Design a protein with these regions (language model features):
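A polyampholytic, Gly/Pro-enriched intrinsically disordered region
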Residues: 163-184
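A polyanion-binding, active-site-adjacent surface
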Residues: 2-154
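Short, charged, surface-exposed secondary-structure boundary motifs
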Residues: 153-163
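Polar low-complexity intrinsically disordered regions
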Residues: 1-4, 119, 177-184
Length: 184
């Protein structure tokens, strides 16, 4: 391993730990709505759970606006992250690193992570995430909503609003494998 690649690996590991720390800080004990996005941004200063993000924070802004019915600003992001926690809304990424690989490669780990989080509802954001993860999550008996939600960028903002609002209203089908023989 060269000195350059070693330094790059350290930077990436530090960035991952920072993302994990902030995400844990804003996770509630019980998750009502789990949002699964594609991957964290490659820019190290941007992430859904960072309280200070100066540019390109559209996923956070649209989720906060639709869930909390409040207008997000750069100044109130920390408060809105706390309110999302109180609303039991939590976001994870299909890939824990900025995307490097086929989406399907990350699905088995995603299923395990989602089982541990045990949410009441799962909303998949972005078509490739839906295409890779919907069937495996559903087949695993997890409460995934069958709504394809686009990422709120590149002109898809209005489509995101419509699809995400619909996904929030729908109740996922009760998955048989989540029931015990006694109760279900």
């Amino acid at each position: 391993m060269t000195a350059v690649s070693s330094a790059k690996n350290r930077i990436q590991a530090n960035a991952r730990r920072r993302r994990e720390r902030w995400a844990r800080h804003f996770r509630s004990d019980h998750i009502a709505t789990l949002i699964v996005a594609e991957a964290p941004p490659s820019e190290l200063d941007r992430y859904f759970y960072f309280p200070t993000v100066s540019t390109q924070d559209s996923l956070f802004r649209y989720v906060a606006r639709l869930v909390l019915d409040m207008e997000p600003t750069r100044e109130n992001k920390r408060d809105l992250l706390e309110r999302l926690r109180e609303a039991r809304v939590y976001l994870i990424d299909l890939s824990p690193e900025p995307l490097a690989g086929a989406h399907a490669d990350f699905v088995p780990r995603l299923v395990r992570r989602v089982r541990r989080l045990d949410p009441d509802r799962i909303i998949l954001v972005k078509a490739p995430v839906f295409d890779a993860a919907y069937v495996p999550l559903h087949d695993a008996g997890l409460p995934v909503v069958n709504v394809r939600v686009p990422f709120p960028g590149s002109g898809q903002q209005r489509n995101f609003e419509v699809a995400f609002s619909r996904a929030l209203r729908l109740r996922p089908a009760i998955a048989p494998s989540r029931h015990t023989d006694e109760g279900g």
